[in-house]
Amino acid sequence: MKKISVLLLLVLGFIFMKAQNTYFPQVFFDKKIARDMLSFGNSTIEGVASTKQKNNWGIKPVFGTKHYAPKGTVVMLFPVTPYFEEFYNMRKKYENKKTTVYMSEEAFKYKIEALTDDHGRFKFEKLKPGKYYLETIVNFTATASYQEQTGRTDTYNGMGGYMYSSPIYQTFFYGYSAANRESKFVEIKQDGELKEINL
């Protein structure tokens, strides 16, 4: 009986355990293509990294407050190779709270990094013409609110008899740390081109 109880407990544990699935692209990563795309050119991509706080439905409001990337935030630039396209499509299709899509360690090495300044600005210089993917994680302090009953008011009739009570609520605001992934594809068509973007 004891063995059955232990076995049943283990089975229930596996059923309710939140499994984390991990996927990797199955396309061959050609480091020669990636290295060639990241070799020196005369083009520049510069921009500003910012984000907006998501609402209760997980959507960033159009007219919401912008939170600029803090100084020192890393912005990564990846060359868009066939391997990267496969990675991006898999991430778009499969990634959620239980599933993560990763690049191989070797593919992740082929990128250029830039740091943001005090106003969230960044710059990538000496790029060749080609298609690139830029990504950053913008950390910010978000705000939320909740209501709490802080008292009540009693109502009496004209003769002084008690009729009913109504709660009095007060709204409290608090801040919490949040982060959003911001990304964009950028294509440089001519050598010497300057692209200005907003992430």
Which ranges hold each PLM region?
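A short tyrosine-centered beta-strand micro-motif
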Residues: 127-136
